[in-house]
Amino acid sequence: MIEVIPGEQTSRETVDAASALVRRIGYHPVEEREVPGFVENRILYAILRECLDLVDRGIIDPEGLDLNVRWGIGYKLAVIGPMELLDMAGLDIYDAVGSYLNQDLSTSGEVSSTIRDLIGRGRLGMKTGGGIYDYTPEQIDRLRAARAGKLVAVRKALEA
């Protein structure tokens, strides 16, 4: 997926040509209006903010959270978009749950204190050998290779 974001002066012809190019290289163009961070990052960062809030408050540890997301919503969202999920579950269900749950979700405008603490200690993630988790160079190589292989497999399954 590649976000196609035309400016105010961008012609329809240019947008169509960009979308055609995206399709030719094997991706799905998604046309949208400009918004800070673009749509994909905004959705990702909303998820990350809530995940970090749950860890910061001691509701769940990082390992449990990764398992929960990987085998819960991540697994589901690989095959159905959020708007389709709403229709499948029922808008009345979303309304009932959202009426009490939305008020308890994180609305913080700040970066997680956990993240800031880790950065302050020089723990920037895999590139420094550790962030939330610790990594050896061999583990990093294995994780990156496994991720690439799984992404290819998921893409093939979605295209089937």
Task: List each model region and its residues.
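A general alpha-helix detector
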Residues: 1, 47-51, 96-101
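NAD(P)-dependent Rossmann-like dehydrogenase/reductase catalytic/cofactor-binding core
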Residues: 13-16, 23-34, 56-57, 62-160
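Conserved phosphate-handling catalytic cores of large alpha/beta enzymes
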Residues: 1-10, 14
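AAA+ ATPase "lid" subdomain C-terminal helix
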Residues: 45, 55-56
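Structural/interface elements that position substrates and couple domains in central-metabolism enzymes
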Residues: 27, 44-48
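Mid-domain beta-loop-alpha active-site segment that forms a flexible
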Residues: 39-40, 47, 89-93
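Glycine-rich "substrate-gating" loop/helix at the edge of Rossmann-like oxidoreductase active sites
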Residues: 7, 35-40, 57
